């Protein structure tokens, strides 16, 4: 339990020892293309905006990655997503749990686009406008090694802010 300054309580159930990961995808209502899967470095329960993350995942097995892909595709289709979707997961003992799904562009899409040298926002925009379907694009992500997303904190400019990381985002940006 985390007491918020506005006197509301945020109850957040979590899985002890879970690894957090997230997937971003483009969906045209029928077909889904996973643009990237990132593994968080901080423990599950730290806000995704405050967590370092690795693209592609460094410690997730093929079974887990396939479950993430399957869940992402099913959720995107079930929500009738046309455009981008971000789905966050908790993984414990190779079992994948869904934390949340956001049918919108997430803060990780520009990071993935830059890492893979693919204009995913342009593709998604064309899909949303009905100009193209997912199958119309020739996706060819290129990368070598790993890309790391790192949060930027401005605690020195806001000295009275609680610095303890948790389910509410504290960072002011990412690099």
Segments (PLM) and residue ranges:
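ATP-dependent carboxylate activation and anion-phosphoryl transfer catalytic cores
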Residues: 3-175
């Amino acid at each position: 339990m985390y007491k918020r300054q506005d006197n509301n309580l945020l109850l957040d159930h979590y899985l002890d020892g879970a690894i957090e990961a997230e997937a971003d995808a483009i969906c045209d209502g029928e077909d889904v293309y996973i643009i990237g899967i990132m593994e968080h470095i901080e423990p599950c329960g730290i806000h995704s905006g405050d967590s370092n993350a690795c693209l592609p995942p460094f410690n997730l097995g093929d079974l887990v990655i396939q479950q993430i892909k399957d869940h992402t595709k099913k959720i995107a289709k079930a929500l009738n997503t046309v455009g981008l979707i971000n789905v966050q997961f908790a993984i414990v003992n190779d079992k994948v749990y869904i934390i949340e799904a956001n049918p919108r562009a997430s803060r990780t899409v520009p990071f993935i686009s830059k890492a893979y040298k693919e204009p995913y926002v342009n593709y998604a925009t064309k899909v949303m406008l009905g100009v193209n379907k997912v199958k119309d694009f020739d996706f060819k992500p290129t990368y070598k090694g790993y890309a790391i997303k790192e949060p930027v904190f401005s605690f020195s400019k806001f000295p009275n802010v609680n610095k303890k990381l948790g389910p509410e985002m504290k960072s002011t940006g990412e690099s």
